């Protein structure tokens, strides 16, 4: 009895360890083989257990290890900038971790159930990869919609990164789980065949990274400056510090007028609402047009509705357009669509907002911009824009992406997460978007990591964190459509589900036997 309990406890610790080691496959560590080890370890453990209790608890420990270490930076943001009790902060992050872990538990329960009648290891491997893909879709789209820490991102510098332009990050994740499940079954059944097949798959996928799906346009090379203000978030919205904040950005910007084509400031670089800074924006726009330089900046836009209340938008605007001088509200803008839960939007917001408005309670609810928006025009450059968290939403970025897009643009403010791994994971996700769509990304943040990302996902240049400085570089736009940009990854999901249905169909005799057995022993 003691040996049995000790073995069970050891399994739980092992599951926790496998979950934790998966985090080190992501940035800033970037040791990509650990993703395979983490998934393989989970599969070996759940396929080795015979009771539902063991399967559920081991998966829980794996998920807690993976998500608590991988997402601990969220607690930093909550603890430093949201005025709630520490116990409440801990409860919020614990709830998020358990919620995300439930998706891993769902995967394990369904996979072990299917294993009862899917007897061939090749069928089980495909089923595991398809099931993981479906669960990842659910985690990324349902309820709070949080697709962070998808294992495909860990391969941005790995040997199967070439799948990115074909099938996106989901395709990479699918192949990772397929390879991991083959390794797990090889170890579990002591058969060499699955192991050899996993090596063959890896060898076949590696040459895909040699294909260049885009064409560089060196004749259109542009000089771009990304300004990293490094503004203290505690002082950001303090009215006494607004002029100081603007002074920092202007000190970096004014000497560059006429020397660079495009200057970029980060998310909400200009404190306060757009209309309140109209005089500054008009004056700055005049100076920019005079020197033939563009400025792209983040700003909060407060629009008066029916002369009674305001709609607030997290926006990006463009100044310096010689074809169209700035005038509020300018059409050359982007309004953030996907708002962050408990920061920019709140649960049941549609119910509470009219109540707060009726009692004149000063709560600044943010509004979403349209899902599909026009590109930013920085003549003759066109950019597909996103703000902060939105860069993780691959489908939204792809749906807004156009064939004539020259660059992808992301403005962010990761000061919330201090010197944690969060900003590095954010940058890694942006690198994957560049690889998927074959376009360079201009990634400008308040305190880092500000970077220029090439169309193949590699980093051309970047700034150190926590300093106020400017990144100036020459970069060429690219053209061309990757297969992922044209078709997305839906067809992978559909084909995988059809294969699984076929597998279940040809295994129907085994399914019937199991059903009969349970019916007799009911």
Curated annotation (Swiss-Prot):
Membrane protein topology class: Multi-pass membrane protein
CDD domains reported for this sequence: ALP_N-acyl_transferase
UniProt keywords, alphabetically: Acyltransferase, Cell inner membrane, Cell membrane, Membrane, Transferase, Transmembrane, Transmembrane helix
Pathway(s) the chain acts in: Protein modification; lipoprotein biosynthesis (N-acyl transfer)
Subcellular location: Cell inner membrane
Keyword Membrane: yes
Entry GO terms, CC: plasma membrane
Top EC class of this enzyme: transferase
InterPro entries: ABC1_TM_sf, Apolipo_AcylTrfase, C-N_Hydrolase, C-N_Hydrolase_sf, LNT_N
Signal peptide: none
HAMAP family: Lnt
Name of protein: Apolipoprotein N-acyltransferase
Organism: Blochmanniella floridana
Gene: lnt
């Amino acid at each position: 009895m003691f040996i049995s309990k000790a073995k069970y406890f050891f399994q739980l610790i092992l599951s926790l360890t496998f979950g934790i080691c998966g985090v080190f496959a992501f940035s800033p560590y970037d040791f990509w083989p650990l993703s395979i080890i983490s998934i393989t370890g989970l599969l070996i453990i759940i396929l080795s257990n015979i009771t539902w209790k063991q399967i559920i608890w081991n998966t829980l420990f794996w998920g807690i290890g993976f998500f608590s270490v991988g997402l601990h930076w969220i607690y930093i943001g909550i603890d430093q900038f949201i005025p709630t009790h520490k116990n409440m902060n801990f409860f919020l992050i614990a709830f998020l971790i358990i919620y995300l872990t439930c998706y891993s538990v769902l995967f394990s329960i369904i996979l072990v159930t299917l294993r009862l009648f899917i007897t061939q290891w090749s069928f089980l491997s495909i089923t595991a990869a398809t099931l993981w893909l479906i669960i990842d879709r659910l985690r990324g789209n349902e309820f709070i919609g949080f697709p962070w820490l998808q294992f495909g991102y860990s391969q941005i510098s790995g040997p199967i990164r070439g799948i990115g332009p074909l099938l996106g990050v989901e395709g990479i994740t699918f192949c990772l789980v397929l390879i991991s499940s083959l390794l797990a079954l090889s170890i579990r059944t002591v058969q060499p065949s699955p192991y050899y097949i996993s090596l063959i798959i890896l060898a076949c996928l590696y040459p895909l990274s040699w294909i260049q799906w885009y064409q560089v346009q060196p004749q259109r090379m542009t000089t771009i400056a990304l300004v990293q203000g490094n503004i203290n978030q505690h002082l950001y919205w303090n009215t006494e510090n607004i002029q100081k904040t603007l002074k920092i950005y202007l000190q970096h910007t004014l000497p560059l007028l006429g020397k660079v084509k495009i200057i970029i400031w980060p998310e909400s670089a200009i404190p306060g609402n757009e209309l309140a800074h109209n005089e500054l924006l008009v004056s700055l726009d005049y100076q920019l047009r005079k020197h033939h330089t563009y400025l792209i900046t983040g700003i909060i836009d407060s629009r008066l509705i029916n002369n009674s209340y305001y709609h607030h938008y997290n926006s990006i605007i463009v100044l310096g357009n010689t074809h169209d001088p700035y005038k509020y509200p300018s059409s050359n803008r982007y309004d953030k669509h996907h708002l962050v839960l408990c920061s920019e939007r709140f649960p049941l917001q549609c119910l509470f907002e009219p109540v707060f408005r009726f009692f004149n309670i000063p709560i600044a609810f943010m509004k979403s911009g349209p899902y599909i928006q026009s590109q930013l025009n920085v003549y003759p450059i066109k950019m597909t824009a996103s703000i902060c968290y939105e860069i993780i939403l691959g489908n939204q970025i792809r749906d807004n992406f156009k064939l004539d897009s020259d660059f992808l643009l992301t403005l962010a403010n990761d000061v919330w997460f201090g010197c944690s791994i969060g900003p590095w994971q954010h940058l890694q996700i942006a690198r994957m978007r560049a690889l998927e769509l074959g376009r360079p990304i201009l990634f400008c943040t308040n305190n880092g990591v500000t970077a220029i990302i090439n169309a193949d996902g590699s980093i051309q240049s970047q700034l150190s964190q926590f300093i106020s400085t400017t990144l100036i570089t020459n970069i060429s736009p690219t053209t061309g459509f990757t297969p992922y940009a044209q078709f997305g990854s839906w067809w992978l999901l559909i084909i995988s589900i059809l294969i699984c249905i076929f597998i279940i169909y040809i295994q129907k005799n085994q399914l019937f036997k199991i059903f009969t057995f349970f019916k007799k022993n009911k």
